[in-house]
């Protein structure tokens, strides 16, 4: 590599196949140029992250496979977004994949950048056997309370499916009033590919709704905080009052 410039080496690395990473890491490490040695360190970190992701993907179907082993055939993962905000809806999603589906990067939506969530949103919809999204607005949240509203959103999501699952993996909850076997999994959105995918669909859908509200009520900053109780949001409420999308039951102390 001594005969190549740093720029040329960077261009090679950008198109390098993963199988050749170790070979190039060793070559770059012995280069006398500090900048090239720095590229070796970056490439080694990238390889380490790839290996960690491969290891994670090997375990992310465990709960789905347990369901198949029990004889279930159509397994869905379900999760919600928006239980905590002061404004806007709560959104739930359910996703059904074929057995042993693996999608690189699918994880708890809170651990992903917005750009990555948006990218995976499209991939998940393409890869899923089926998916459903349920939305419950702020007025229903005030009427039924947030927990019941969350269950309502989940049931709406299930009802959007072409075919009901015979087994549901749920993120740390059991949905009442449905005749489907369920497995509540603590931190399921980082342990099950189906729940993780559902968390991404729910989050991206809700964020999209809040972006629309931001155009209607630009002074509240919904685009940035998505309705959560930030300092900016509370200051806007104090200055302008509440909007029709605010959850009054969440604002009893200041109304």
Swiss-Prot record:
Record keyword rRNA-binding present: no
Predominant location: cytoplasm
Keyword flag tRNA processing: no
Every RNase H type-2 domain range: 73-255
Residues in the signal sequence: none
Binding residues for a divalent metal cation: 79-80, 171
Cited InterPro entries: RNase_HII (IPR022898), RNase_HII/HIII (IPR001352), RNase_HII/HIII_dom (IPR024567), RNaseH-like_sf (IPR012337), RNaseH_sf (IPR036397)
Cofactor annotation: Mn(2+); Mg(2+)
An annotated GO BP: DNA replication, removal of RNA primer
Stored Pfam families: RNase_HII (PF01351)
Gene3D superfamilies: Ribonuclease H-like superfamily/Ribonuclease H
Any GO MF annotation of the entry: manganese ion binding
Family statement drawn from the similarity comment of this UniProt entry: Belongs to the RNase HII family.
Identification of the protein by name: Ribonuclease HII
Organism: Clostridioides difficile (strain 630)
Lineage of producing organism: Bacteria, Bacillati, Bacillota, Clostridia, Peptostreptococcales
């Amino acid at each position: 590599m001594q005969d190549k410039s740093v720029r040329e080496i960077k261009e090679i690395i950008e198109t390098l196949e993963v199988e050749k990473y170790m070979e190039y890491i060793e070559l770059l490490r012995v280069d006398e140029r500090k900048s090239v040695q720095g590229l070796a360190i970056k490439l080694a970190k990238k390889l380490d992250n790839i290996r960690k992701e491969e290891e994670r993907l090997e375990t992310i179907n465990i709960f789905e496979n347990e369901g198949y082993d029990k004889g279930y055939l159509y397994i869905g993962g379900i999760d919600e977004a928006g239980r905590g905000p002061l404004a806007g809806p709560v959104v739930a999603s359910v996703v059904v994949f074929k057995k042993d589906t693996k999608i690189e990067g699918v994880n708890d939506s809170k651990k992903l950048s917005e750009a990555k969530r948006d990218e995976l949103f499209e991939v998940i919809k393409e890869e899923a056997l089926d998916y459903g999204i349920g939305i419950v607005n702020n007025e229903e949240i005030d009427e039924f309370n947030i927990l019941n509203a969350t269950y309502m959103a989940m049931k709406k999501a299930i009802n959007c499916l072409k075919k009901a699952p015979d087994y549901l993996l749920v993120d740390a909850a059991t949905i009442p009033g449905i005749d489907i076997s369920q497995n509540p999994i603590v931190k399921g959105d980082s342990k099950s590919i189906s729940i993780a995918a559902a968390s991404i669909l729910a989050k991206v859908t809700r964020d999209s709704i809040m972006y629309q509200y931001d155009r209607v009520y630009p002074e509240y900053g919904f685009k940035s905080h998505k309705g959560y109780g930030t300092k900016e949001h509370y200051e806007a409420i104090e200055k302008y009052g509440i909007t029709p999308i605010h959850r009054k039951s969440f604002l009893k102390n200041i109304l």
